[in-house]
Amino acid sequence: MDSRIITTHMNWEEDAAELSLRPRYLNEYIGQQHVKENLKIFIEAAKMRKESLDHVLLYGPPGLGKTTLSQIIANELGVNIRTTSGPAIERPGDLAAILTNLQEGDVLFIDEIHRLNRSVEEVLYPAMEDFALDIIIGKGPSARSVRLDLPPFTLVGATTRAGMLSAPLRDRFGVVNRLEFYTVPELTFIVSRAADILQVVIREGGAEEIARRSRGTPRVANRLLKRVRDFAQVKGEGVITTEIAKEALERLQVDACGLDHIDHKLLLAIIDRFDGGPVGLDTIAATIGEESQTVEDVCEPYLMQIGFMQRTPRGRVLTPSAYQHFGREMKS
C-alpha cells in the first residue's frame, strides 16, 4: 500500500506520541455523544451494584476512538486493562492464559475481534457468559472436561467489520455501540486540544482547516496537526494560521475534502476507465494497485459518507458530486 498521511491505521512509531493526545476519562472525550452518555450510565450502574460492567462491543471505521474508549472504560471503572488483538490469539491456550491472569473486574480489550478463529471463540463463550473456562484433559475416550471459575471481568471487543462476527459471539455482548464519523466542529475542538497538549500555538481558522480535511477521523486530525506543526515552525514562526494550514495540507496532497492521492487515483480510475461504474471491488483494487480490503475498509467508508460513491448490487457507482469535485461532466 502507498504511504499516505491520512491513513486511519496506527503504526508503532506513532503509538507513544498518540497516547499523549488521548483523553483518559469520559468528560474529556469529544464527540460520540450518545455512546458516551450511555456508557456513563452503564458504568455508574455497575459501580453502584459493585459488579463488572457488561461486555461491550465497539464497531465502526478505523481511527474513531474504539481503543481510546476501551482505556476510558477501564479508567472510569478504576480497574486494570489487558490489551490484545484477534490475530494475536492463535490457539485456545493463548486465550486461556490471558483469562486466567485477569483480576476481578478487569477489562480485557480485544481489537479486531472479528479475526478470532472459531476454536478460540468457543473458549470465549463460557468465559463471557458464565465466567468459566472449560479445559479438556486427556485424549480420546478417556478425555474429560474440567471447568475452572474465572473472576468476573468485562470484555471490550472492537471491530471495523461487525458483519463478520459470528452470531453466537455478537449475541454475548450486552452493550453494542457504533462509532460515527466526527463533525468538523468536534474535530476542530480535538485539534485545538491536541495543539494545547503539544504546546503549539494554533488559530481557530487553522484548527478548522485541519479538521475539515481530516476525513471525520480524530486519528487523521492528530497526524495532520503534527505535520502542519512542522510547516508552521519552519515557515510560520511556530503559529498555525489558516494560510499555513492550507499551504501545508496542499503540499501533503490532502485536498479541501480530505481526499489524498490514493482517493484521487481511485475516483479517477472509475471515471476514466469505467464511466463512473458500476464496477466491482476487486476490479477497482487491481486497477489502482491496492488490496481489496484496504479499498473497502479505508477508502470507501469516507467516500460514501461525503456522498461521492454508492454501493449497489452491481458494484460501486460514483455520484454527480464526485464528478463535480474534479470538474468533470457526468455522462448521461
Curated annotation (Swiss-Prot):
Record-listed DNA binding positions:
311, 316
Q: Which domain of life is it from?
A: Bacteria
Q: Which GO terms describe its cellular component?
A: cytoplasm; Holliday junction resolvase complex
Keyword annotations: ATP-binding, Cytoplasm, DNA damage, DNA recombination, DNA repair, DNA-binding, Hydrolase, Nucleotide-binding
Renumbered residue ranges of the record's region Head domain (RuvB-H): 256-332
Transmembrane segment boundaries:
none
Q: What is known of its domains?
A: Has 3 domains, the large (RuvB-L) and small ATPase (RuvB-S) domains and the C-terminal head (RuvB-H) domain. The head domain binds DNA, while the ATPase domains jointly bind ATP, ADP or are empty depending on the state of the subunit in the translocation cycle. During a single DNA translocation step the structure of each domain remains the same, but their relative positions change.
Quaternary context? Homohexamer. Forms an RuvA(8)-RuvB(12)-Holliday junction (HJ) complex. HJ DNA is sandwiched between 2 RuvA tetramers; dsDNA enters through RuvA and exits via RuvB. An RuvB hexamer assembles on each DNA strand where it exits the tetramer. Each RuvB hexamer is contacted by two RuvA subunits (via domain III) on 2 adjacent RuvB subunits; this complex drives branch migration. In the full resolvosome a probable DNA-RuvA(4)-RuvB(12)-RuvC(2) complex forms which resolves the HJ.
What is this protein for, i.e. what is its function?
Answer: The RuvA-RuvB-RuvC complex processes Holliday junction (HJ) DNA during genetic recombination and DNA repair, while the RuvA-RuvB complex plays an important role in the rescue of blocked DNA replication forks via replication fork reversal (RFR). RuvA specifically binds to HJ cruciform DNA, conferring on it an open structure. The RuvB hexamer acts as an ATP-dependent pump, pulling dsDNA into and through the RuvAB complex. RuvB forms 2 homohexamers on either side of HJ DNA bound by 1 or 2 RuvA tetramers; 4 subunits per hexamer contact DNA at a time.
**Which family does this protein fall into?**
Belongs to the RuvB family.
HAMAP family recorded: DNA_HJ_migration_RuvB (MF_00016)
Protein's name according to its UniProt entry: Holliday junction branch migration complex subunit RuvB
Organism of this sequence? Brevibacillus brevis (strain 47 / JCM 6285 / NBRC 100599)
